[in-house]
Amino acid sequence: MLEARQRAFAMIRPGTACADIDRAANGFLRQEGMGEYLLHRTGHGFGLSNHEGPWVADGSQDVLAENMLVSVEPGIYIPNLGGFRHSDTVLVTRDGYECLTHYPTDLNSLTVSTGKLFTRIRGALVRKAVGI
């Protein structure tokens, strides 16, 4: 999944067809035998809504332009196991892109288990209760 993300990043620049970015990212996942686990496009734009064009998707006619905001979020979803996705917000710049998301990509940071989730929720509730 992270390699698919890198393949999408490598293509982001003004003038790139969004369908080509999707083919690079999701094509890699298909090549690796993950095609049956793909449930959505590689990304989408942001603006007045959080899901709008340009659509980074197969069949999209959209082309990137400078100052567009797009998500890069290739993902695989395996029944009875879970989903794997890292969603990044990316600004298209004159010469390429700037990733506005700064989150670790190591496996431990990307793993959310039930235990970790409940610990986070409990911690948030305690902080709220004590006013911090």
Annotated model-derived regions:
Residues M1-I132:
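Active-site neighborhoods and metal-handling regions in enzymes and metal-associated proteins
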